[in-house]
Amino acid sequence: MGARDDELAARWVQLGVFSPINRLHSTSNPFSGKEPWNFNKRAEMIMGDFLRLRHELIPYLYTANHRACFEGCPLVRPLYWEEPEQKEAYEFPNEYYFGSELLAVPITERMEPEAELAGVKAWIPEGVWFDYQNSRIYRGGKQMMLYRTLEEMPVLAKAGAIIPRSLDRMGGTGNPNCMAADIFPGADGCFSVWEDDGRTEADGENDDRWAVTRLSLEWSPLTRFVIDGVEGNRSAVPEMRSWKLNFRNVEYGVPEVTVEGERVDAVVSYDGVRTNLTLELSEIPSVKTVEVRFGTGMEMASMDRADQAFEILNRAQISYDKKEAILDAVKKQRGDALLTIQSIEENTVLVGALAEILFSDGN
């Protein structure tokens, strides 16, 4: 039966969200209910956020399961599935690929109370990777510790990744009217969203039930993102569909948006702290092709290290003088900053978390 542990319960929900089957099991024991509202407010909020994310990821999950059915490539794959020649791929059994675009590194350890962070040792494969939640950038081909608050689980998106999500808030079985795509820089990418009509019995990949919408990114020299008009069973998707395009980890750029070659207006916003550019397109015919161009290309961007350090230090249960001295070292020093931090603070988790941000973007 185990014992109540709100923190671990929140971590297990996070793991469940990035698993093939996500269910909250309990027993006849009246104390073992797993509904989020049975836990403390922090755990309840975290569970709710992750369960809503799971619902948003249905287009990604459904497409991954279609791929598993027809191509034999499972949703969850061990590291050695993709990197059989790498020794490290056999040494991290709890780390796994989740679909074609993501790498999941679950945390199941308790947070260190002073730092209010928990850590997990990870191997990051070659290439450039982006944290799906906090936008940190990692250069792969190495092992490192990843530290997160209880609100976060390390999930990394590869360069060029495209993650489709549903933004429909009401429950239902229909395909979404509002979609989002999280688009990560640094490489070309493509993702075909598979949907079905919810009625026709499936008898093969090419039967009449499927609708396919291809999303593609050309990163350089001139950045271009395309949503192709739906192919196949067009009746399976809404006639009109709204899109929210999130270009992650980029410098601000001015987009030109066209639908079948005709310019249309988009609502554009930029988060300079998280370095995310967002375009919102309303009521676009699903059968028409949308193209977003950035005339001068786009540049990859990373969050300011001092801002990241401030977030970590502001939460830490240590003296204010130490916090100020550590932040000053992050701002003024580069290669020697870690040595200075180690001379100021003895908490290895806190020092490790600061080391992660000092080196996560390749600096």
PLM feature spans:
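Intrinsically disordered, low-complexity segments enriched in glycine/proline and serine/threonine
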Residues: G198, D265-V268
